[in-house]
Amino acid sequence: MATQISTRGSQCTIGQEEYSLYSSLSEDELVQMAIEQSLADKTRGPTTAEATASACTNRQPAHFYPWTRSTAPPESSPARAPMGLFQGVMQKYSSSLFKTSQLAPADPLIKAIKDGDEEALKTMIKEGKNLAEPNKEGWLPLHEAAYYGQVGCLKVLQRAYPGTIDQRTLQEETAVYLATCRGHLDCLLSLLQAGAEPDISNKSRETPLYKACERKNAEAVKILVQHNADTNHRCNRGWTALHESVSRNDLEVMQILVSGGAKVESKNAYGITPLFVAAQSGQLEALRFLAKYGADINTQASDNASALYEACKNEHEEVVEFLLSQGADANKTNKDGLLPLHIASKKGNYRIVQMLLPVTSRTRIRRSGVSPLHLAAERNHDEVLEALLSARFDVNTPLAPERARLYEDRRSSALYFAVVNNNVYATELLLQHGADPNRDVISPLLVAIRHGCLRTMQLLLDHGANIDAYIATHPTAFPATIMFAMKCLSLLKFLMDLGCDGEPCFSCLYGNGPHPPAPQPSSRFNDAPAADKEPSVVQFCEFVSAPEVSRWAGPIIDVLLDYVGNVQLCSRLKEHIDSFEDWAVIKEKAEPPRPLAHLCRLRVRKAIGKYRIKLLDTLPLPGRLIRYLKYENTQ
């Protein structure tokens, strides 16, 4: 039979389970469900039966106590609830998992307070029982009465022990604090009328007024303010009650606080005012209220971030619009020198960017060392990129050196960001607006080659990218474009067709003489050069000797020979060719003199120039000759 717990005016049942729901389950399934239930109960805390019993005894609805940080009283040992189905199953199969201990009966004093039994309390007092003695958690019966909302019991204890009205628990919580947290207004009013201090805070320096604002309890706030609660008290984070009510957009509570003397310009430990909180959290109505009462629209936190900056950062469009309409300064920078337009571009909010463009100083942007174009391109915000370019932002503005150093490749242009992201549309957009593809330490063309994106390569070359790009920090005797394309012969041929210079690949310092041992690739090609040592120039033959490239040495040399005249293979290259008998034809191909037609083709292409190779089709020559010049027919 289920255990019944009766209270005045209501009756609740606990421990009663619908066993028919589980009649169709096998024993294994029941065991599995029991394990899951036990884990859930352990995570949740008290059992369902205990929670139900508590709710019935308190005569409170299930939704009464929704707050995550509310103070809970120390639980006296409750009566043992009957064993449910899951516990029974688990005890049957594993007595070692569940050892149900006999719990002590409930404390009569606590039971009397929970039940609101004033006569029982009076009887205990008459019998000489000391009801002003705290338990191990520092709780008095007065605290229990305030927590459970038993105003009759509270008054009995107040009259019997008036000196305990402001006594604190070990968590430094007073009866006023507990009554406020639980929303028991009659208890709160009774305590304040009896002379309780309204401003005693807990260990976190949170006062009853602060907790009332946290719970959005306007009546409790009104009662506390009427009894002279300090409206400007700060918690350990420096927050006031007004900060808390603003964060919850509670206009009614805000009005009570401001009318009660709350300062609209009070700052927390980080220099944040209530208006800053409203802008940061997107509370437009609270923002309007504070502006009406004279709060500073241009308030800044300790890191110099303005309210407008935070609103842009969190993409609160209506808040940004309101702040700008009230004259907010869009040219205040944070500690990193960034403006609201920077963060809006980084977030990719087109509407906010459009609002900020007319009111943002280009001089301030230049001083910041980073253009909004960089941030939009870095995050692939193409729509914002279009808006900035339409507003005539300089597409070639470089990152400041101190900002470029934050990137390992020392990138500086918005174009580089677009190419790194493999964003073909943004790359084309920037190039159409005049982006210079040759401004970065590492050419964007090399990045495009590494990605293998022919469309991006073609765009960069069409807009003047140097096809013979080198890397200053890792010097080579031959173009880095060839080095990056070596592992893909079709890509290498594509670049050579467009005019890449292959001659330096065969200009070896050692010629037919002995070559020094090749250094390890990890120390030569991948590591950054030492600061106190000038990096040595890597020869082509040295690079193709790397283990990851050497197996392709023959085909690579074969492709390059189609784009050079009479050259001399060094001893190292000959060694590679001789290492595989099928490559013997490559050695024969390199022997001078090269065919006259081939030499003439090279002479014509050189006269045209690598930047005009794409104009070969316009020459007044036979189609067959044009194809030969373009290497479309190499026979």
From Swiss-Prot:
It is found in: Cytoplasm, Cytoskeleton, Stress fiber. Pathway: Protein modification; protein ubiquitination. GO terms for biological process: actin cytoskeleton organization; cardiac muscle cell development; cardiac muscle cell differentiation; dendritic cell migration; heart looping; intracellular signal transduction; podosome assembly; proteasome-mediated ubiquitin-dependent protein catabolic process. Its main location: cytoplasm. GO terms for cellular component: cytoplasm; cytosol; nucleus; stress fiber; ubiquitin ligase complex; Z disc. Keywords: ANK repeat, Cytoplasm, Cytoskeleton, Phosphoprotein, Repeat, Ubl conjugation, Ubl conjugation pathway. Component of a probable ECS E3 ubiquitin-protein ligase complex which contains CUL5, either RBX1 or RNF7/RBX2, Elongin BC complex (ELOB and ELOC) and ASB2. Interacts with SKP2. Through its interaction with SKP2, likely to bridge the formation of dimeric E3-ubiquitin-protein ligase complexes composed of an ECS complex and an SCF(SKP2) complex. Interacts with JAK2; the interaction targets JAK2 for Notch-mediated proteasomal degradation. Interacts with TCF3/E2A; the interaction is mediated by SKP2 and targets TCF3 for Notch-mediated proteasomal degradation. Belongs to the ankyrin SOCS box (ASB) family. This is Ankyrin repeat and SOCS box protein 2. The lineage of its organism: Eukaryota, Metazoa, Chordata, Craniata, Vertebrata.
